[in-house]
Regions:
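Juxtamembrane segments of multi-pass membrane glycosylation machinery
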Residues: 75-99, 107-110, 115
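Start-transfer (signal-anchor) and selected internal transmembrane alpha helices
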Residues: 1-24, 123-128, 192
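Transmembrane signal-anchor helices characteristic of membrane glycosylation enzymes that use polyprenol
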Residues: 8-43, 133-140
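Short hydrophobic alpha-helices at membrane interfaces in multi-pass membrane enzymes
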Residues: 178-198
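Transmembrane-helix motifs of polytopic, lipid-linked glycan transferases
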Residues: 97-130, 171
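Extracytoplasmic loop-helix module adjacent to an early transmembrane segment
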Residues: 23-71, 77-83
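Membrane-interface micro-motifs in multi-pass membrane enzymes
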Residues: 124-177
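Juxtamembrane "helix-exit" motif on the non-cytosolic side of transmembrane helices
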Residues: 29-31, 79-84, 111-115, 138-152
Length: 198
């Protein structure tokens, strides 16, 4: 079970998460902007479908990305386009916020895992998580195709189809490690309910 945190520890974790979020937002807005440009991006930014598997579609199991990407695109049009008057930049802003949020959640979950399971102090878990975060950018420094990073994808669609679901899965595994009682609750459900939940 997760321990209680002191006020100072909460402030440290919130400050750390804010720095990660702002650095990733700056990265995805200025250094590596998430601009829609290819046919997949244009198609899936506005491809609305039912939130259930479509059996005769080419990939019936792709539900989350095909719901989440157009939802983010629609929110961008209603929230940011009235302010920016630029469709492409509105989408890039929303995509940057969404991807930065998921990466922040990922690094935050890793810091909590270090604190709870590895018994690290909050300051040590923040230091280790900072290196963990930075190594995502350093690991491909000598790549022949440029300075790619572990959060790299060829287009915006790949972020929603691969990067975000992978991050979400890692965070869910960490949550199940931190709260093992959740697995007990899940294992007591019947098969149909398990399928609906997962």
């Amino acid at each position: 079970m997760v321990k209680k945190y002191s006020r100072k520890e909460h402030i440290l974790l919130i400050g750390f998460s804010t720095i990660i979020f702002l650095s990733m937002l700056l990265f995805f807005l200025r250094i590596h902007p998430l601009i829609i440009y290819d046919a997949d991006d244009w198609l899936y930014a506005s491809y609305f479908r039912l939130p259930i598997p479509i059996w005769h579609d080419w990939n019936p199991s792709r539900v989350f990305p095909e719901i989440f990407m157009p939802l983010c695109s629609t929110l961008a049009v209603y929230l940011f386009m009235p302010l920016t008057h630029d469709y492409i930049w509105s989408l890039a802003l929303m995509y940057g916020i969404v991807v930065s949020s998921f990466i922040t959640l990922y690094v935050y979950a890793f810091a909590l895992f270090l604190r709870e399971k590895m018994k690290a102090s909050v300051s040590n878990s923040i230091i280790i998580s900072t290196f963990f975060f930075l190594f995502h950018f350093l690991v491909f420094k000598t790549s022949e195709s440029g300075n790619h990073h572990m959060f790299y994808a060829n287009d915006v669609t790949c972020y929603f189809y691969y990067i975000i679901p992978t991050i979400l899965n890692v965070v869910l595994v960490i949550i199940l490690e931190l709260y093992p009682d959740l697995m007990d609750i899940f294992s007591r459900k019947n098969g149909i309910l398990k399928g609906v939940i997962s």
